[in-house]
């Protein structure tokens, strides 16, 4: 199923831009869930998720740089209301994992117009301001209704947060940040991201509130978030077990099943 992510051409007023953005957000945020709506999942539950229902396995596992830890990656977009809503629950979940995981975020860009917010994220990261600013950026966009979609608007905003405007702009336009944008695009393609928020675990498994929602049906967003975290817990246990099996040299269940079919 294809989704039209093109913002309609309209008179360039703030009202029209916001209306167009809302339409785009709806398509981006729910793209994955709609894609899974026709998957049979009669026996799937968040506590016992099924591949192709509450989560999916990538055709090609991606390399991670987390060492012995399990890498957990959130793909997100600052202007996505579902990313904003999911963030507090995700942050709490990450804290509970302690040293078991290596957590990172990847800001996505489905269009060139998304790139200013990608640059915002990576500039804050480079300046060591991300932990303090992540929630503030979400709040500015979704609560204060600020349009942080241009370099000027973003620079003005960070300046109000006590960050040196000139230094920020220099980092925002730096080669280092540009390199991060290229890497983000590669990851977005590798993980086949067509909706956010989405969480990848150990470079192999992905899930999201919209994927889980395609199985559970119409539920309050808080229920979908909680269910997604349950699936993530299950995937963490699965990845941990598979790593232990691999380290001992014992064949994984998938390998045994594949061998039995030959």
Model-assigned labels for residue ranges:
Residues 70, 99-102, 127-132, 164-165, ...:
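Loop/turn elements at helix/coil->beta-strand transitions in domains of secreted/extracellular proteins
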Residues 5-7, 13, 160-262:
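C-terminal cap of thioredoxin/glutaredoxin-like
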Residues 20, 153-154, 168:
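Hydrophobic/aromatic residues in well-formed alpha-helices
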Residues 96-126, 132-159:
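Structural microenvironment flanking redox-active thiols in thiol-disulfide oxidoreductases
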Residues 2-115, 232-262:
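Extracytoplasmic thiol/disulfide redox context detector
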Residues 76-79, 106-110, 122-123, 139-145, ...:
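Second-shell loop/turn segments in exported
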Residues 68-69, 73, 79-87, 110-117, ...:
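Solvent-exposed, acidic/flexible segments
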Residues 79, 90, 94-97, 124-128, ...:
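Sec/Tat-exported extracytoplasmic proteins
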